[in-house]
Swiss-Prot record:
Inhibited by quinolones, such as levofloxacin. This is DNA topoisomerase 4 subunit B. Residues 427-541 form the Toprim domain. ATP binds at Y11, N51, D78, G118, L119, H120, G121, V122, G123, S124, K344. It comes from Streptococcus pneumoniae serotype 4 (strain ATCC BAA-334 / TIGR4). Its cofactor is Mg(2+); Mn(2+); Ca(2+). One of its GO terms (cellular component) is chromosome. GO terms for molecular function: ATP binding; DNA binding; DNA negative supercoiling activity; metal ion binding. Keywords: ATP-binding, DNA-binding, Isomerase, Magnesium, Metal-binding, Nucleotide-binding, Topoisomerase. Binds two Mg(2+) per subunit. The magnesium ions form salt bridges with both the protein and the DNA. Can also accept other divalent metal cations, such as Mn(2+) or Ca(2+). Residues 391-401 have a biased composition (Basic and acidic residues). The gene is parE. Mg(2+) 1 binds at E433, D506. Mg(2+) 2 binds at D506, D508. Residues 391-421 are annotated as: Disordered.
Length: 647
């Protein structure tokens, strides 16, 4: 993809515009970074990295280095033009404006970026506000400058020249220490950062991104010569491949478009879309353009070649996307950039759809005409997908009609114990392993808003099965009907009967397996539930410690071995320890107190921070290939003596 060159002289102090002050960032950090947990902590990293990415995206710098330092701080070094070092119109150094004024950045003037995801200043000031200290070092115009901020963004030094450098050497280095009084954790995760940098490297063809962890001496570099083509190969790494990677690129109205496509033998699609290197997880007009182009071109080809007869209806888009892995990356000029809502999760720029549609349609049409046998195989695969879809819809409709004809008291063959409330915004559905635990849960629940659905039979592995076979599985079918929002392409989150879907299983390998099967189903066929944060895992205690009898009995619970050791010290000698092997060992009161009471329970919310990472993880753990799964288990699972039986 061609890059729009921007004159280095135009990126100066006048290019930084100020929109508003930095007030309230420390008071309401969630408004700026989403949360103050681990996700919010790493959002600070993304803000600074995105600034460096923008420089590389605009053609300045071919390397970005991230370092987790021994003291827990983090450094991002780019080799771009270097932030402006002169005085701003406000009467203070421009660097100080960038790091202390909210929404001061290069995006808003004409001399900064033509396309941009993050911006020097826009995120920098937020990172500074939420750090106990921050240092910025700038190499530019043959000199090296440095400034330090402390206590949430207050400058403690002015911008000083601290040395010289060759005029050819430029860049910005930012080091910051997150404020432990704001974040629940300040522990940067090597794997989380490395996977995000890997994704960015795919989108920045021939730019090297590195991560070094000085705490553990781990280090890794990412560099991809083929960009999004390599990205698609990465997504399909553990799958059976049906086609080579198809790559299309083009430019129209200032929009630059790159698309890579490849088909595998799976039954679901995986489309990742990006705007100015920022992931648009909810898609948008650019993704709509891609999908419409594929559907239109494939149907036209099927008609011309006679694979679809006159009497046949056109295939649906979902038929052509079965088994498709695709990466769409577009660069949108600032004057056309428009997102829906406050986040950058969905592109709203109207012009993006016809631009992407036109480029992809032209290139895909040519490819199909040049590769007739492969094209025909893809059409036949889509026809099979249509047949499976129609069979699945018929089975689903029959299932729904059969359930609706039953009396309320016989609902779901007596499986579901419904909540009294009819308010979906408050109701919770517990998916409980086994009848015995289901019985305790029914007795212990708050019947006003908690519904119980025991899972008695085997849950099918939905990563391997066709939709028609999935709907034959009684447990899956019951869940679909209970949740009430459809499944797959027909899923509508607005119709869901519950605000929280809570998976509650035993704390053993069987329980973990059931969790994995259920999460795979939700990920594949009810993904909006997961993306919107409606799926949870209950966390029952592992231990119960008691001492005394009758009214004098003391009881406490431990969820980890560390908590157990604390209880041992607290209770001293004479205490009784019970290790829970299953939910059924707890009576109704204990289950309510430890696992179901909103005031005292602990729930794990299931989220998708990185879709590419999630897709690969599901493929490895639930797919057909044994060797990648064995390797992942060997690398990531520690087997202890507690899990080993010695005879």
């Amino acid at each position: 993809m061609s890059k729009k060159e921007i004159n280095i002289n135009n990126y100066n102090d006048d290019a930084i515009q100020v929109l508003e002050g930095l007030d309230a960032v420390r008071k309401r950090p969630g408004m700026y970074i989403g949360s103050t947990d681990g996700a919010g902590l790493h959002h600070l990293v993304w803000e600074i990295v995105d600034n460096a990415v923008d420089e590389a995206l605009s053609g300045f710098g071919d390397r970005i280095d991230v370092t987790i330092n021994k003291d827990g701080s983090l450094t991002v070094q780019d080799h771009g033009r270097g932030m402006p070092t002169g005085m701003h119109a406000m009467g203070i150094p421009t660097v100080e404006v960038i790091f202390t004024i909210l929404h001061a950045g290069g995006k808003f003037g004409q001399g900064g970026y033509k396309t941009s995801g993050g911006l020097h200043g826009v995120g920098s000031s937020v990172v500074n506000a939420l750090s106990s200290w921050l240092e910025v070092e700038i190499t530019r115009d043959g000199a090296v400058y440095k400034q330090r901020f402390e206590n949430g963004g207050k400058p403690v030094t002015t911008l000083k020249k601290i040395g010289t450098a060759p005029k050819s050497k430029t860049g910005t280095k930012v080091t910051f220490m997150p404020d432990a009084t704001i974040f629940s954790t300040t522990d940067f995760k090597y794997n989380t950062i490395s996977e995000r940098l890997n994704e960015s490297a795919f989108l920045l063809k021939n730019v090297t991104l590195s991560l070094t962890d000085k705490r553990t001496n781990e280090a890794i570099e990412f560099h991809y010569e083929n960009g999004v083509q390599d990205f698609v190969s990465y997504l399909n790494e553990d799958k059976e491949i049906l086609t080579p990677v198809l790559y299309f690129e083009g430019e129209d109205n200032g929009f630059q478009v790159e698309v890579a496509l490849q088909y595998n033998d799976g039954f679901s699609d995986n489309i990742l879309s990006f705007v100015n290197n920022v992931r648009t997880k909810d898609g948008g007009t650019h993704e709509t353009g891609l999908k419409s182009a594929i559907t239109k071109v494939m149907n036209d080809y099927a008609r011309k070649t006679g694979l679809l007869k006159e009497k046949d209806k056109n295939l649906e888009g979902s038929d052509y996307r079965e088994g498709l892995a695709a990466v769409l990356s577009i660069l949108v000029p600032e004057e056309h950039l428009q997102f829906e809502g406050q986040t950058k999760d969905k592109l709203g720029s109207p012009l993006a759809r016809p631009v992407v549609d036109g480029i992809v349609a032209d290139k895909l049409t040519f490819f199909l005409m040049e590769n007739g046998e492969l094209a025909s195989n893809l059409i036949r695969k889509a026809i099979k997908a249509r047949d499976a879809r129609e069979a699945a819809r018929k089975a689903r409709d029959e299932s729904r009609n059969g359930k609706k004809n039953k009396k309320d008291k016989g609902l779901l063959s007596g499986k579901l114990t419904p909540a009294q409330s009819k308010n979906p915004a408050k109701n919770e559905l517990y998916l409980v392993e086994g009848d015995s635990a289901g019985g305790s849960a029914k007795q212990g629940r708050d019947r006003k808003f908690q519904a119980i659905l025991p899972l008695r039979g085997k849950v099918v592995n939905t990563a391997k099965a066709k939709m028609a076979d999935i709907l034959k599985n009684e447990e899956i079918n019951t869940m679909i009907y209970t949740i009430g929002a459809g499944v797959g392409a027909d899923f509508s989150i607005e119709d869901a009967n519950y605000d929280k879907i809570i998976i509650m299983t035993d704390a053993d390998t069987d329980g973990a397996h059931i969790q994995t099967l259920l999460l795979t189903f939700f990920y594949r066929y009810m993904r909006p539930l997961v993306e919107a944060g409606h799926v949870y895992i209950a966390l029952p205690p592992l231990y119960k410690m008691s001492k005394g009898k009758g009214k004098k009995e003391e009881v406490a619970y431990a969820w980890t071995d560390g908590e157990l050791e604390e209880l041992r010290k607290q209770f001293g000698k004479g205490a009784t320890l019970q290790r829970y092997k299953g939910l059924g060992e707890m009576n109704a009161d204990q289950l309510w107190e430890t696992t179901m009471n909103p005031e005292t329970r602990t729930l794990i919310r299931v989220t998708i921070e990185d879709l590419a990472r999630a897709e690969r993880r599901v493929n490895v753990l639930m797919g057909d290939k044994v060797e990648p799964r064995r390797k992942w288990i060997e690398d990531n699972v520690k087997f202890t003596l507690e899990e080993t039986t010695v005879f």
